[in-house]
A protein has these predicted regions:
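Acidic beta-to-alpha connecting loop that harbors the catalytic carboxylate
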Residues: 7-9, 292
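Catalytic histidine neighborhood in serine/cysteine hydrolases
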Residues: 24-51
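Alpha-helical scaffolding segments of alpha/beta enzyme cores, especially the outer helices
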Residues: 18-21, 72
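Glycine-rich beta-alpha junction loops
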Residues: 7, 39-40, 120-122
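Short beta-strand/loop motif that positions the catalytic acidic residue
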Residues: 3-5
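Conserved alpha/beta-hydrolase "acid-adjacent" motif
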Residues: 10-17
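C-terminal, loop-rich substrate-recognition/catalytic regions characterized by aromatic stacking residues
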Residues: 44, 49-339
């Protein structure tokens, strides 16, 4: 069996990763392979896989997959040719460096779970926050939701999963945290966990967390000699690496929704889909937090009512506070790969 998926599969970014993991856990004797490329849904079969939106991947990743993984796999099972041992257990493309990596298992065994903390003054770092930090806050208004893309589209776009996030960074209902300029590469391999300490003024809210790669101010793509595609400037581009959402009422149990107590600090913890990305030296890591992502995610009335039957009058503003002090630290658990 071979599970094939895309890092930027807007239809099902969850499936391929987790089918592979489930088979490894529940049926370890099954011959099982995983291939993840920098693709949207089905891009490995229907497009060249050189780019998605403005972000380039350096080569025809779809053709590489077909020649080096798909054909050998079907030659073995359909024609009895070749050796299945030539196909690694996990083959994953890492954006940022634009390289394929081979692993004996996914997530790799040599990752170290590392906390990336929200800190004062919109800072992000690997050290615990200092004492005395006041929470950051914003007002989430369902009548003015944060859009998922800067353009106006009839259909949901594929490109939003690598879109430039600068269009939301200056909104007052989006919190932005970023590291200093990285002095060395940081490679992430596996699922990310968002662990937030929050309070809200109402009884429900959504929490959208976005992990972003901030390109240097002088970054530009050169002309591609293979494809003849012209170069272009990417100065300060804020590439969405992974984004996910937790509807707050389900923070403790998906079967038993639970209202928030207004003003009371609560933990909102959830697992985001797997990431395979290298944050390069000279870049920055950014985290954005918001409470709407419209129309990708339906609007939350921010009130503990049945969302499917509620009325317009149920939709209300909510003041959201995100805490980042030693007793109420908020952070992302990052699977850092040591190569």
């Amino acid at each position: 069996m071979m599970e094939v998926g895309g890092l930027f599969d807007a239809e099902d970014c969850f499936g391929a990763w987790n089918v592979y993991k489930a088979i490894e856990k529940q049926s370890p004797a099954t011959s099982n392979r995983l291939v993840i490329g920098p693709w949207f849904h089905g891009q490995w079969a229907g497009a060249d896989g050189t780019h998605l939106g403005n972000v380039r991947f350096g080569s025809n990743t779809s053709l590489w997959f077909q020649q080096n993984r798909e054909i050998p796999f079907f030659n073995y099972y359909l024609k009895g040719k070749g050796n299945l041992d030539s196909i690694p257990k996990a083959t994953v493309f890492f954006t940022g460096e634009n390289e394929w990596h081979e692993f004996k298992i996914w997530p790799p065994q040599d990752v170290q779970l590392t906390n990336l903390y929200l800190q004062a003054n919109n800072q992000l770092g690997f050290t615990q926050p200092a004492s005395g930090n006041n929470p950051d806050e914003y007002v989430s208004d369902p009548a003015k939701p944060v859009p998922y893309t800067s353009g106006i589209h009839e259909d949901r776009t594929r490109e939003y999963m690598t879109d430039d996030q600068r269009f939301t960074a200056n909104r007052t209902d989006v919190l932005v945290y970023k590291t200093d300029t990285l002095k060395e590469d940081i490679t992430i391999a596996g699922p990310i966990t968002a662990d937030l300490q929050v309070s809200i003024s109402t009884t429900d809210a959504d929490f959208v967390v976005k992990l972003i790669d901030v390109f240097p101010d002088d970054f530009a793509y050169e002309e591609d000699a293979n494809t003849q595609k012209p170069g272009y400037i990417m100065n300060g581009y804020q590439m969405l690496v992974r984004g996910d959402v937790m509807r707050g009422r389900y923070r403790n149990n998906f079967e038993k929704p639970e209202a928030f107590i207004p003003g009371q600090i609560s933990k909102v913890k959830f697992t985001m889909n797997d990431v395979a990305h290298k944050f390069k030296k000279g870049h920055r890591i950014m985290v954005q937090i918001q409470s709407s992502w419209f129309p990708l995610v339906d609007r939350n009335p921010q009130k503990m009512v049945d969302i499917y039957t509620c009325s317009d009058s149920d939709f209300q503003k909510a003041t959201i506070k995100i805490y980042h002090d030693p007793d109420h630290a908020s952070f992302l658990v990052m699977p850092v790969l040591h190569e």
